[in-house]
């Protein structure tokens, strides 16, 4: 427990599912007293068998709310250090250092997994098996946009189709197409991954050109398994 007799110099808050109110209170007391505040990751939620549960970031927010102090740094995502360290650890075991252009950041969260990849200049793959959904992908700001999109990890061994923009402004991905017209993103097939890939390109292009997109201006997807 925190005590004024032994002032902590630093607080490191990480993922601990058995964290109690008293633990968070002790962290807050120490931070308020001047301890430097570090965190390991800021995932607000975490997928579990029964649904979406609070993640490390939610518990971090409780301490931030109580103290008004933001962590000075995060050891995990959305910083890219973890990806750099993974490459270096692999090389330390006697393997060649894998270049960034031969690496890919994979995850289900845009604001941690994918942002970390973008910060570190890694290609990234967003999968739909966790918290990110098609709407969030279409509305993603530039720093949260993945290089590739897949329904799950099974597509890692398959070539990704590249959406192509034609002269009319329509984005095509194999047999699916998407376009922006009258303030709306339209898609030919809202049940396929290719439709989503095309729609994402149309939405991002429109947003980058100043369009104000929202859930009401992008199509609803129901991706078929």
Positions of PLM-derived features:
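Acidic, Mg2+-coordinating phosphoryl-transfer loop and its flanking beta/alpha structural elements
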Residues: 105-139
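Catalytic cores of secreted or luminal carbohydrate-active enzymes
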Residues: 142-161
């Amino acid at each position: 427990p925190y005590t004024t007799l032994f002032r902590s110099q630093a607080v490191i808050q990480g993922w601990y599912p058995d964290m109690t109110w008293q633990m968070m209170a002790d962290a807050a007391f120490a931070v308020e007293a001047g301890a430097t505040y570090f965190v390991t990751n800021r995932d607000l939620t975490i997928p579990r068998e029964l649904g979406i549960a609070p993640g490390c970031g939610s518990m971090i927010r409780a301490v931030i709310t109580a103290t008004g102090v933001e962590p000075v740094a995060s050891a995990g995502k959305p910083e890219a250090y973890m990806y750099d360290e993974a490459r270096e650890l692999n090389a330390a075991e006697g393997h060649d250092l894998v270049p960034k252009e031969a690496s890919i950041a994979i995850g289900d969260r845009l604001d941690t997994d994918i942002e970390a990849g973008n910060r570190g200049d890694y290609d990234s793959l967003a999968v739909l098996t966790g918290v990110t959904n098609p709407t969030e992908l279409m509305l993603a700001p530039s720093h949260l946009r993945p290089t590739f999109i897949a329904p799950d990890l099974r597509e890692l061994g398959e070539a990704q189709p590249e959406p192509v923009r034609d002269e009319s402004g329509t984005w095509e991905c194999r047999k699916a197409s998407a376009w922006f017209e009258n303030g709306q993103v339209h898609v030919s097939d809202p049940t396929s991954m290719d439709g989503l890939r095309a729609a994402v390109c149309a939405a991002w292009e429109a947003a980058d050109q100043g369009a104000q997109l929202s859930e009401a201006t992008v199509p609803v997807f129901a991706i078929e398994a």
